[in-house]
Amino acid sequence: MTKLSVNINKIAVIRNSRGGNLPDVVKAALAIEGFGADGITVHPRPDARHIRYDDVRNLKRVIATELNIEGNPIDSFVDLVCEVCPAQVTLVPDAPDAITSNAGWDTVAHREFLTSMCELFHRYGIRVSIFVDPKPEMVRGAKECGADRVELYTEAYAAGYAADREAAIAPYVEAAEAARECGLGLNGGHDLSLENLAYFCERIPWCDEVSIGHALISDALYYGLENTVQMYQREIRKAK
């Protein structure tokens, strides 16, 4: 069954808006684990506007589920990942000033660089996922780079879901089938929500993991954190 990794960046945004350590992102991550999440995702950026590098170090010491670190593999990020040795690193080609991730890798054009990154992280025993648009050629390119998984950038699916969910999911099914055919694990993330999650998992039941942050933390303001984590897990289970 698809696993739920909760991105806690938005919790760090609230903390950083006031200074101090409230809310405590480590305490929140432990609570989210206790409420039933299968993993914790963080996306530290160079400007430290939400998750900071020290947060990542502190999280690795205490969480019991999988830690997934997302980010653009600049030198400082690579050094952090090799130091912390999470279960998974997800390589994302976002610019330093990007508000959020907005495109996947061109795994053909950047094959040499991505191959070197996969080789490096594998030496530390870290599973490597590459963030890609839902295009079979990008999925196959990730395989050629030596990745273990791809994460499909699901923003277009989420944006098109209300108007025509079948049309919205179609390119993702095609890309997911390409991943399965070439032996890649499969993740999904970006703008997945209570509205569109169940159908995504229903149509792509072999998806290994979804990473959800903004929508889940927003829903937690209305429903409470414990209830919200369990609501998302129920949406995933609908696809069984």
Tell what function each PLM region has.
Residues 75-85, 135-145, 188, 192-207:
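Catalytic cores of alpha/beta
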Residues 127-179:
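Histidine/lysine/aspartate-rich catalytic loop segments that bind and position anionic ligands
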Residues 1-70, 74-76, 80-86, 167:
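Conserved N-terminal beta1-alpha1 strand-loop-helix module at the mouth
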Residues 2-8, 40-42, 67-69, 89-91, ...:
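Hydrophobic faces of well-ordered beta-strands that scaffold small-molecule active sites
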Residues 36-38, 62-64, 83-89, 123, ...:
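Glycine-enriched alpha-helix->loop->beta-strand junction motifs that scaffold or abut catalytic
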Residues 49-75, 107-129, 165-188, 194, ...:
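Alpha-helix-loop-beta-strand connector modules within alpha/beta enzyme cores
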Residues 91-98, 149-161, 206-225:
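Glycine-rich phosphate-binding active-site loops on the catalytic face of alpha/beta enzymes
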Residues 60, 103, 164-165, 219-240:
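C-terminal helical cap(s) of enzyme catalytic domains, especially alpha/beta-barrels
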